[in-house]
């Protein structure tokens, strides 16, 4: 178009027509483009406005839901006498996710209980106080609840699960139901995470047969009961060998296995380390619970018991001897018989307690004798002579050895013929006495006389000749036969 307008050969009319067409087309295109640009801007602005409105609406909805939840709880806590239908209608609008979140926080331990449960329990504990101004903190409310529970004396529920049926399946770490008549003292110490939670409970008062203290604990929890029921009339006692000991004097004992050995029968004087668990509390009837600590003393070993048995036996033998002496007189015949019977009964009872050990010792001795049959009683001749150490063995004994078997040194020997100690016992007589006696007997002889070796040699030669003669005679006799 512009080239045609620049052409000089065209007439002015044609140029004016072309200019009009050009301007109209340009304006039409500009209007068309302006329309498209306006639509794009409007669409982007509309999208941004819609997203912001949606976010704000969601935030408002969540805030409205949270406010509705807390408002409904406040209303139900401030006015406990309202009908449950109103609470159900308000809870319909509460989002299910909020309930799940509350359950999750309750299970994790972030909050001990939901606000409505705390308020319901506190309303039942103290109905005269109403309003939400008393519940600024959950911790303070729980502590006040524990103090009010300790002060109250009527049967009550410490923690109650209220609301929908979905809440009935949950059991919190501090929920417990106790039914007592006089007083209840509960001291609990709980810790978060993996720490061990311990609950110590001491109950004083009469316990119903139907009422049983139950504890529904959380992760790790140890409960210790120490109860001892004193009953005037004990009846309906069922024995359970795995978890109960025999009942003595109307007392029920629930025991647990202990590291130390304990006797089979228990009495009031004995103390055992068993922890008492009221597993079958309803069979105990009514009585006054008593708390007492129990310990155990280990049984002495075999050697100590053997020594005690020996001492007891010696004393018993001395007592029997005295009883026999007293029984010789006619006035003490009946008394001696009674004492003998009682002492025999005591000895039999005492020996019965040691019977397994004594039988085992006798069996060991018999087995040892079977293994070594050649070992017998050591005679005085077989006793070793160790100088003056063995002097006490033959101090009061008379020597049976012939005088020919003694030598000059006092040692028995059949090859010598000295007579120095024929009448003197070497081991019993001191050296000074023997020396004086030897000097007095010898008189003017020398202190150390020489031995007669020639006589000994002659006797040895004579013995050899006689033996040779016997050997020579025997073969001839054999040949003659």
UniProtKB/Swiss-Prot annotation:
Signal sequence annotation: none
Protein name in the entry: Protein JASON
Cytoplasm keyword on record: no
Keyword Lipoprotein: no
GO annotation (BP), single: male meiosis II
Disruption phenotype: Diploid pollen grains (dyads of spores instead of tetrads) due to defective meiosis II. Abnormal spindle orientation at meiosis II.
Record function comment: Required for normal spindle orientation at male meiosis II and normal formation of tetrad of microspores. Acts as a positive regulator of PS1 in male sporogenesis. Not involved in female meiosis.
Region (Disordered): 226-250
Miscellaneous: Diploid male spores in jason mutants give rise to viable diploid pollen grains and spontaneous triploid plants in the next generation.
Keywords per UniProt: Meiosis
Biased composition (Low complexity): 232-241
């Amino acid at each position: 178009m512009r080239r045609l307008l620049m052409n000089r050969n065209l007439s002015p009319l044609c140029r004016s027509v072309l200019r009009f067409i050009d301007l109209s087309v340009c304006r039409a295109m500009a209007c068309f483009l302006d329309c498209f640009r306006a639509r794009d801007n409007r669409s982007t602005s509309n999208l941004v406005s819609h997203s912001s409105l949606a976010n704000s609406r969601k935030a408002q909805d969540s805030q409205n839901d949270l406010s509705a939840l807390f408002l409904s709880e406040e209303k139900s806590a401030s006015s406990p006498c309202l009908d449950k239908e109103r609470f159900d209608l308000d809870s319909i609008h509460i989002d299910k996710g909020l309930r799940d979140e509350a359950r999750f926080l309750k299970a994790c331990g972030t909050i001990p209980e939901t606000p409505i449960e705390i308020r319901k329990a506190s309303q039942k504990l103290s109905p005269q106080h109403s309003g939400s101004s008393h519940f600024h903190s959950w911790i303070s409310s729980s502590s006040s609840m524990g103090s009010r529970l300790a002060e109250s004396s009527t049967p009550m529920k410490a923690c109650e699960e209220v609301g929908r049926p979905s809440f009935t399946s949950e059991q919190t770490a501090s929920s417990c139901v106790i039914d007592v008549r006089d007083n209840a003292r509960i001291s609990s110490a709980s810790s978060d995470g993996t720490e061990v939670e311990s609950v110590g409970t001491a109950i004083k008062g009469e316990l119903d047969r139907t009422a049983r203290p139950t504890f529904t604990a959380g992760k790790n929890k140890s409960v210790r009961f120490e109860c001892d029921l004193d009953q005037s009339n004990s009846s309906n006692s069922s024995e359970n060998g795995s978890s109960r000991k025999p009942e003595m004097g109307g007392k029920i004992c629930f025991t647990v296995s202990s590291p130390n050995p304990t006797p089979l029968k228990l009495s009031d004087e004995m103390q055992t380390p068993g922890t008492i668990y009221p597993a079958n509390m309803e069979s105990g009837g009514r009585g006054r619970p008593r708390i007492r600590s129990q310990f155990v003393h280990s049984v002495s070993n075999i050697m100590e018991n053997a020594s005690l048995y020996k001492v007891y036996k010696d004393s018993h033998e001395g007592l029997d001897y005295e009883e026999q002496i007293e029984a010789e007189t006619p006035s003490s015949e009946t008394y001696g018989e009674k004492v003998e019977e009682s002492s025999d009964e005591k000895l039999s009872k005492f020996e019965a307690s040691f019977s397994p050990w004594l039988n085992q010792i006798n069996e060991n001795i018999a087995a040892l004798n079977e293994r070594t049959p050649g070992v017998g009683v050591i005679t005085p001749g077989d006793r070793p002579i160790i100088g003056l150490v063995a002097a006490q063995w033959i101090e009061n004994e008379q020597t049976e050895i012939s005088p020919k078997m003694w030598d000059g040194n006092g040692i028995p020997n059949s090859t010598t013929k000295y007579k120095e100690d024929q009448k003197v016992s070497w081991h019993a007589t001191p050296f000074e006495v023997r020396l004086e006696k030897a000097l007095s007997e010898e008189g003017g002889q020398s202190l150390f006389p020489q031995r007669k070796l020639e006589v000994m040699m002659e006797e040895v030669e004579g013995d050899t000749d006689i033996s040779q003669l016997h050997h020579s005679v025997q073969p001839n006799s054999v040949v003659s036969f």
